[in-house]
């Protein structure tokens, strides 16, 4: 019998061209970084961003791969007499070029936010009608990443709007990762591969594991709800073009079990890992989750293939993700609030993956099992494996 290594996630405890394209070579693995919105919303300023930059270095997050520091909404001031956007002078008195220089001095990359509409979601000036000016300004400031939102766009075509900003970024000449935040309304996974480097597949995430935060005309979703919305999308993801199920809520008050499950599933999805917590005051448990090198390696695997849900039974879901070197990641998610016991009979998990064109073949192959949360090898797949999965955990 052929012996393969198998990683198992088992958790117990330029000039404008006529046919402009996005910048190739960026986001060859899912982008990793931090964004201000989930924790701070519009309450951001120059001092906060600098202290976050410091914390990304001092905590070890930068060296773990989290390199993008992204300002979300509400950094904007007004446009100058020529129409160029300026930073809010009260919040960012030194200006965006100086802030970008500070971020770059820390070995980080500078991310910024705008909106395809006339106003951002926070009521600041949007980029509509100023796309080329804004792209030039971002390039001048040294921006490396643009999140482009979709508020105030009632009469705007999303394909045209996002392609327009893509072309503007290309014309400005600085390689900028283009993160499309259209909330999945126009199914961007079907058309945006040549437009952006990542696209939101859903509305906003809400800081809960299993809930819907309903509002008139829109809703925000818990971890499980967003996970369910990824069904049928995996074939559209890959190096340079990722499905984005939104930023992480790890470290924002959910249980350790829920945080671990959240991080595990986003890693299995090959999703961008964009933190949304206050990294200046993380608990050790949060650090241990966010900086687990072996789980991050599943997310960052060079094949860039999104995981799939193979089966579900009694509140448990069984997920596989093909990895390089003929390895597989395997994860059992417990959606229920109570502990679940299960005996894994590997022969029942023979599957052929249409995306990777690979077969698990437990009948003729023996895989070594490695628990990525304990960082220990735990036998192989020759024998059945009894497991206990805590509620809302993996």
Where are these regions (language model features)?
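C-terminal beta-strand-rich structural cap/linker in extracellular carbohydrate-active enzymes
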Residues: 379-394
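Structural recognition of the beta-strand scaffold that forms the well-ordered cores
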Residues: 26, 30-36, 65-71, 109-114, ...
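Aromatic-lined carbohydrate-binding/catalytic grooves of carbohydrate-active enzymes
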Residues: 52, 56-155
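Glycan-recognition surfaces
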Residues: 133, 177-278
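Bacterial Sec-dependent N-terminal signal peptides
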Residues: 1-22
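Carbohydrate-binding surface patches
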Residues: 266-269, 274-276, 312-356
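N-terminal module-boundary/linker segments of secreted carbohydrate-active enzymes
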Residues: 21-46, 50, 55
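Catalytic cores of secreted or luminal carbohydrate-active enzymes
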Residues: 260-311
């Amino acid at each position: 019998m052929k012996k393969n290594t198998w990683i198992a996630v088992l958790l117990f405890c330029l000039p404008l061209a006529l046919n402009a394209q996005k910048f190739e070579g960026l986001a060859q693995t899912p982008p990793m970084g931090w964004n201000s919105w989930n924790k701070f919303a519009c309450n951001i300023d120059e001092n906060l961003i600098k202290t976050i930059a410091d914390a990304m270095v001092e905590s070890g997050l930068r060296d773990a791969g989290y390199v993008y520091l992204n300002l979300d909404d509400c950094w904007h001031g007004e446009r100058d007499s020529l129409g160029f956007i300026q930073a809010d002078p009260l919040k960012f008195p030194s200006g965006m070029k100086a802030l970008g220089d500070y971020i770059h001095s820390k070995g980080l990359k500078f991310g910024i936010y705008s909106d395809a509409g006339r106003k951002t979601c926070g009521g600041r000036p949007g980029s509509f009608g100023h796309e080329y000016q804004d792209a030039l300004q971002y390039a001048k400031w040294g921006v490396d990443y643009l999140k482009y939102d979709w508020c105030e766009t009632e009469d705007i075509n999303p394909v045209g709007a996002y392609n327009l900003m893509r072309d503007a970024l290309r014309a400005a000449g600085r390689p900028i990762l283009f993160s499309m935040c259209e909330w999945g309304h126009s199914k961007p996974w079907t058309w945006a591969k040549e437009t952006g480097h990542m696209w939101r597949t859903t509305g906003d995430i809400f800081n809960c594991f299993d809930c819907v935060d309903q509002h008139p005309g829109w809703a925000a979703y818990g971890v499980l709800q967003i996970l369910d919305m990824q069904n049928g999308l995996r074939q559209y993801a890959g190096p340079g073009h990722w499905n984005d199920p939104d930023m992480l809520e790890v470290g924002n008050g959910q249980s350790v079990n829920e945080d671990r499950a959240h991080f595990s599933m986003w890693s299995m999805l090959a999703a961008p890992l964009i933190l949304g917590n206050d990294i200046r005051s993380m608990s050790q448990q949060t650090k241990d989750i966010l900086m687990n090198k072996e789980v991050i390696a599943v997310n960052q695997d060079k094949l860039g293939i999104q995981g799939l849900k193979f089966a579900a039974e009694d509140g448990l879901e069984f997920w596989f993700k093909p990895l390089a070197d003929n390895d597989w990641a395997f994860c059992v998610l417990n959606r229920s609030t109570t502990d679940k016991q299960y005996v894994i009979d590997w022969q029942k998990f023979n599957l052929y993956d249409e995306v990777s064109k690979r077969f698990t073949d437990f009948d003729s192959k023996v895989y070594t099992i490695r628990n990525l949360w304990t960082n220990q090898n735990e036998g192989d797949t020759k024998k059945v494996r009894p497991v206990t999965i805590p509620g809302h955990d993996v």
